[in-house]
Amino acid sequence: MGVTCVSQMPVAEGKSVQQTVELLTRKLEMLGAEKQGTFCVDCETYHTAASTLGSQGQTGKLMYVMHNSEYPLSCFALFENGPCLIADTNFDVLMVKLKGFFQSAKASKIETRGTRYQYCDFLVKVGTVTMGPSARGISVEVEYGPCVVASDCWSLLLEFLQSFLGSHTPGAPAVFGNRHDAVYGPADTMVQYMELFNKIRKQQQVPVAGIR
């Protein structure tokens, strides 16, 4: 894999999530991007079981268990303000056995699904983010394949993002700053998705005006 940027695309004013996704994919197709199948990234939140906290008023920590269709044999466990564990798919079974330590938060499942597009050395994924039956937002992932060091290709990624996101082009992901000259890996992408999902969850708690 290469270096990846994950961002949120605001819903266009007067349009639905699905209509905005269609506008975005149409722009990509006009640029010459070709469809390359579908993708899915999902996330379920677990919190520390009350029985493990003791009586000192400790605050429970969160853990996010995630899957990415690009890595069908792997499961990612991201600890709140901590490391990312990459395990095999049996990790989900292990979480059931660990219910005395971690418990699944109610209605915490969030996922994004959509279409993959290939444009020269760029792989683009535009997805609809859903919680339960409802569409909550739009995710955009762009990967530049030939490079594995974020600082070496961010300007190129930025230029490509501007070509179809325009004024909604994101800034450099926080994970780039943490790993400026390090080799980029799948865990870095999952951290970005975790941050995106948490941002969208928070947006559901306050009314958001349409964006032109």
UniProtKB/Swiss-Prot annotation:
Gene Ontology CC terms, in alphabetical order: core mediator complex; mediator complex; nucleoplasm; nucleus
Cell compartment(s), UniProt: Nucleus
InterPro entries: Mediator_Med20 (IPR013921)
One GO BP annotation of this record: regulation of transcription by RNA polymerase II
Keyword Transcription applies: yes
Function, as annotated: Component of the Mediator complex, a coactivator involved in the regulated transcription of nearly all RNA polymerase II-dependent genes. Mediator functions as a bridge to convey information from gene-specific regulatory proteins to the basal RNA polymerase II transcription machinery. Mediator is recruited to promoters by direct interactions with regulatory proteins and serves as a scaffold for the assembly of a functional preinitiation complex with RNA polymerase II and the general transcription factors.
Record family assignment: Belongs to the Mediator complex subunit 20 family.
Protein name: Mediator of RNA polymerase II transcription subunit 20
Organism: Homo sapiens
